[in-house]
Each structure stands twice: as C-alpha cells, then as structure tokens.
Amino acid sequence: MRKLTLATIAAAFSAVTIVVFGLPGSPATGAFDPDRPNGVEDPCRNVQTAKKLLCPDLRIARPSEMYLDRKVVPGRVVLRATNDIRSRGQGPMEIRGHRDHTFSMNVTQAIQRRAGGYALYPTQARLRFFTVGYRWGGSYWKVRDPLHFELWRIDEKRRRTKLVRTGPKQFYCFRDLERTNPSPRSPAAAVYPACNQNPKVRHVTLGTSIGWSDIYPSTYHLQWIDVTGLRGCFAYVLHLDPGNVLFELDKENNVSQRIVRLPWRGYRHRGC
C-alpha cells in the first residue's frame, strides 16, 4: 500500500470543493420544490456556479416492454414495465454514501468541476442495504426513491387528473448498465459497476456516466403497478427523482408516460 504523505493528502483535498449548507426535513415528509432541490439553490441552475461545473442531467424513457402478471401477487393483476434512466448531462450523475446507521447511509452528490476534481453537495437522498431476494442476487446498497411508478386518471385531452395507484418499488442502483447514447464525452467502457453487496462497507459510490443508462427490465423485482379492477384510460407514469433531492441541469425531463387502456390487452388495443 502506498504511504500517504502530507503532500499527497493536501493534493487530495485540493481536488475537492466541499459545499455545506443546512437542510430541512426529509422528502419522506414531502417533496422539495423542483427549483430548490433539498430546499436550497441548485448549483447546476445558478448561472455563476454552473459555469464552473460539469452538471449531470438524468432523463427517463417511456415505460416499455409492458405486460400483465397474474402470478406475482395471488389474486391480483399487475402491469409490469421496463424503466430506462438515462444520463445525458455535461458530467456523470455520481453519489457517495457514508454509513450513519446500521443499514443506511447519508448521500453526498459529487459534481465534476471543469477545472478538475469534484464539488461535493450534501443531499437528503438515502442509501439502504436492501434485499431483492435470492433470484435477483441477494442484497445491495441502493438509492431510496429515485424513481416512482405512478398510474393516473386522464381527461379527454389525455391530461393527468388524479393519481390512483403507485408501484411498490422504492430502491434502485445507479450504474453503467448499457451505453445508449455514444459520444466523444461518453466513456467507451463502464465506469460505475453494479451496486455494492458488502453489508459492512462504510462508504460506497454509485453513478451513471454520460451516454449510459441504468435499465431495469419489466421482469425484475417490483417493476409493476397493481391494476386490479381498474377500467378505462390511464397514464402509466415514470417519475424520476420525485423528492427533488438530486442536483441536475433540467427537472423538466424527469417524467415520462405511456397512455394505457385497462384492462390491458396490449399496445394495439388502447382506444384512448
């Protein structure tokens, strides 16, 4: 192991800017305003601050690969969907967890600086050591509530009017699963691996690089909304960062939807 010198330590600190501010209550008690993630000014949308940063921008693709599942919950009918969280900003979405409880971590967002290194911003996001079951690999350090599955009633103009159901899934990884938008700024190989599975680790880093996606297939654990007994036209919505605890360039691309007719009989039988 390389011996740390005072010069090495000083160099490490010079590569990082730490931004500290007070934060209000957890998003569990109510989402923050999109214009003020975590209840503070967004450095990625402050003109002066953003000039010095390579800010991330996550986007959510429309729900896809949808199908009915009558087996996962006895006596119920659920509509499954694939989600694709796309990283399309100036820099990667990177978050760093630091253990503060037995099975959870607080989260700091690391945003690349144009001059090199990172600026670190505390957030109200949380990581948890979460079990998805043996079939899906056991337990992982995952992000809480980065994406919600929502089902909305719509009017005759397809505008969402009332939230009627939500999906059960709460925990996701941020990782480089598939390079979906290659570009000169997009790394050719994955930088951020699958989520850490060590329950004893004190620190973890999760992220998604520019041009890469974190995709969960419709067959995966809890990728569904219960649609039992519902009839008519609805918007099947994927809502990215619903608590507004991540800093990014644009919050307007954090919602996608697909109009569906229930009972579900496939994409060609909507009539909405």
Predicted regions and their residues:
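Boundary/junction segments of secreted and surface-exposed precursor proteins
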Residues: A31-I85, Q90-E94, H269-C272
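N-terminal export and membrane-targeting signals
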Residues: M1-A12
